[in-house]
Amino acid sequence: MKLRFAPSPTGLIHVGNARQAIANALYARRHGGTFQLRIDDTDRERSRDEYVDALHTDLAWLGITWDETFRQSDRLDRYAAAIETLKASGRLYPCFESEQELASKREARIRMRKPPIYDRAMLRMTAEQRAQAEANGKVPYWRFRLSDQDRGVDDMVMGRSQVKLQSISDPVLVRADGTVLYTLASVVDDMETGVTHVLRGEDHLTNTGVQIDIAEALGGKVGQFAFAHLPLLLDEAGGKLSKRFDGLSIRALRQDGIDPVAIVSYLARLGSADDPAPLSFDDLAASYDVRRVSRSAARFDMRQLLALNRRVMHQMPFGAIRDRLPEGATEAFWMAVRGNVDMVSELRHWWDVVGGVIVPPVQDDEGAYLLQALALLPPEPWDAQTWKDWTTAVRDATGRSGKSVFHPLRVALTGEEEGPEMRDLLPLMGHDRVAERLRIAAR
């Protein structure tokens, strides 16, 4: 068994691309198969090496590893051989229409209430007419002549469907500049590298019928590939996700402090009957079943991802977060703040609270109380019992009770109305910092 993820390096991958990569990698891991990373860089104008590098970085950060990888730009000779095979069999034919001419034809067919598909006019050109067109400086592009039959697709998600090739335009496989399009390159790669299962987006379902037709024209067997087409992933507003919407790129989520475990766990089960839970890649793979994915479009909900990320953070051991903590942060710090951190990006704030510089709000009506508390502040060393001992002494001396004892002290020392347990924060702050903040807040 072999599966592949074949992104084009024309932008940063977003959660929609990542969902497909995760599905392929999990399915391969679940069934002991091979996972191939294929870079679809045949679009020479839009493909960028920087996006290839970003792709590798993002997938590695998500914990997705691949068994083999290559660029389609390194296999142009194989596509050229396939082109010659299709030309020799008469399935690939030259076309000379301009974009304007094609647009006029489409408009005319629409006016006649006919499907706006290609009319195959170039199939009726004689050899002399073709030679004359080339002599006049026209350079052909090349279309694949689809067969006149339906192509059945047994899909693990969508079920059985029929692609009516008669209602589809013969696809362009080679541009006038000689560039090979993905439609052909993908088929050649799948056949020659032994891909057995194709998991991709629902928007490729019609294209699957076309590619089956191309594969058979190149000598492929009927039923050579198993297919699973995942429903489209929509944004929160119900629109289609775009590579150019950077807010949901994997890079942006990483920079925002979302943990990769949360992203993979969320996307792996999005659109299925399984509730997302923070699981390792191996645990997700052990139970992964693409047949549990609903046929309906799934909506990416940032609130659900943040809720899952919160669970991940609250359970994370020190060893797993150590490298992402602010410099100098200890295990005691992490254990103190872990329950109040939803994203890695929030750690800097709490590190400043316990060991940096903050400006606590002045509490004019609590000044006298804070100075009384300062006078009762015990000497170090401090431990988890110090907060209780100190506030008990303050309560007894002032006659206060409940929130009126604790709240002014928390605000003075952290600048926050709520947060981690003060019994855990106090020893991390130290006597001098606590005393200074009490004086500032009492002004």
Curated annotation (Swiss-Prot):
Write out the residue ranges of the motif 'KMSKS' region.
240-244
Q: Give, as one word, the top-level EC class.
A: ligase
Gene3D superfamilies tied to this protein: 1.10.10.350, HUPs
Query: For ATP, which residues are the binding ones?
Result: 243
This protein's record includes keyword S-adenosyl-L-methionine = no
Q: What is its EC number?
A: 6.1.1.17
A single BP term in Gene Ontology: glutamyl-tRNA aminoacylation
Which keywords appear in this protein's UniProt record, sorted alphabetically? Aminoacyl-tRNA synthetase, ATP-binding, Cytoplasm, Ligase, Nucleotide-binding, Protein biosynthesis
Q: Which Pfam families does this chain map to?
A: Anticodon_2 (PF19269), tRNA-synt_1c (PF00749)
| Entry-linked InterPro entries | aa-tRNA-synth_I_cd-bd, aa-tRNA-synth_I_codon-bd_sub2, aa-tRNA-synth_I_CS, aa_tRNA-synth_I_cd-bd_sf, Glu-tRNA-ligase_bac/mito, Glu/Gln-tRNA-synth, Glu/Gln-tRNA-synth_Ib_cat-dom, GluQ/Sye
User: Which GO CC annotations does the UniProt entry carry?
Assistant: cytosol
Ligase among the record's keywords?
Answer: yes
Instruction: Give GO MF terms, alphabetically.
Output: ATP binding; glutamate-tRNA ligase activity; tRNA binding
Q: Where in the cell is it found?
A: Cytoplasm
Residue numbers covered by motif 'HIGH' region:
7-17
The UniProt entry, under PROSITE patterns, shows: AA_TRNA_LIGASE_I
Catalytic activity as recorded in UniProt = tRNA(Glu) + L-glutamate + ATP = L-glutamyl-tRNA(Glu) + AMP + diphosphate
What does the UniProt function comment say about this protein? Catalyzes the attachment of glutamate to tRNA(Glu) in a two-step reaction: glutamate is first activated by ATP to form Glu-AMP and then transferred to the acceptor end of tRNA(Glu).
Q: What NCBIfam families does the record point to?
A: gltX_bact (TIGR00464)
Q: Which family does it belong to?
A: Belongs to the class-I aminoacyl-tRNA synthetase family. Glutamate--tRNA ligase type 1 subfamily.
Oligomeric state and interaction partners are given as: Monomer.
- HAMAP family referenced in this protein's UniProt entry, alphabetically: Glu_tRNA_synth_type1
Protein name from the UniProt record:
Glutamate--tRNA ligase 2
Whose protein is this, by species? Gluconacetobacter diazotrophicus (strain ATCC 49037 / DSM 5601 / CCUG 37298 / CIP 103539 / LMG 7603 / PAl5)
